[in-house]
């Protein structure tokens, strides 16, 4: 499907996902994807970038990547142009330009705390803390995991489905990963998340849209109790 033209009557959201190397205390982004969407999940623009400074220049770090077995995928995507290779500052500039063009200050992610941390950590690591923040000042961070907990997690059908399939955490809570939520909302019970930036964005925007369609009260902001 071709990206939609900008409709100035709509409010836009940047749905974003990162894949990282290094440890969870200092995650460094090598893959970042985002899509400009509305709350119904319509896609207006898609972006996929490989961070040159981490992926190609930090080869030892890349061997620590959680999904290191997927690295050949990125070489193929960089070769065929499916993902653009760029320096971090260029990626940041393009994101800021997209946010300005679509007049949005909202960035949403699934488990947004991690993506906010990974982009901030990468920004500080590459600039030696000269520049500390990746997103424009005043950006509002949304978390589809919070939305899903408030909407999908309260549905008796979801609880029954999780119990039937064994999607229960050790503490008894229902699992809320993007992969499992997408299996539920799509009916594709064999679905496996790709764990690459843009591909994951395109299922996470469906989670956002599903939550909106239920017309239930839900928290959206990352730092909202």
Give the location of each predicted region.
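Short alpha-helix plus adjacent loop in nuclease-associated cores
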Residues: 142-169
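Hydrophobic/aromatic-lined pockets within catalytic cores
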Residues: 123-127, 152-156, 186, 209-216
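Conserved non-catalytic scaffold segment of RNase H-like nuclease domains
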Residues: 2-122
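A short, structured active-site edge motif that brings together acidic residues
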Residues: 48-53, 134-152
């Amino acid at each position: 499907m071709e990206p939609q033209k900008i409709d100035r009557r709509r409010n836009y959201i940047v749905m974003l996902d990162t894949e990282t190397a290094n440890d969870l205390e200092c995650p460094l982004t090598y893959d970042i994807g985002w899509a400009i969407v509305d709350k119904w999940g319509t896609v207006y623009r898609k972006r996929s970038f490989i961070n040159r400074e981490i992926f190609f220049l930090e080869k030892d770090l890349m061997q620590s990547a959680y999904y290191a077995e997927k690295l050949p995928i990125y070489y193929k995507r960089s070769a065929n142009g499916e993902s653009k290779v760029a320096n971090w500052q260029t990626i940041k500039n393009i994101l800021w330009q997209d946010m300005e063009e679509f007049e949005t200050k909202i960035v949403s992610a699934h488990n947004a705390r991690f993506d906010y941390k990974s982009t901030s950590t990468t920004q500080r690591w590459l600039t030696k803390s000269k520049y500390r923040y990746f997103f424009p000042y005043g950006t509002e961070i949304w978390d589809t995991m919070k939305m899903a907990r408030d909407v999908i997690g309260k549905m008796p059908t979801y609880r029954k489905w999780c119990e039937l399939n064994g999607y229960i955490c050790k503490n008894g809570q229902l699992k809320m990963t993007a992969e499992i939520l997408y299996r539920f909302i799509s009916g594709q019970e064999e679905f496996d998340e790709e764990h690459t930036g843009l591909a994951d964005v395109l299922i996470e925007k469906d989670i956002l849209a599903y939550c909106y369609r239920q017309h239930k009260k839900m928290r959206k902001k990352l730092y909202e109790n």
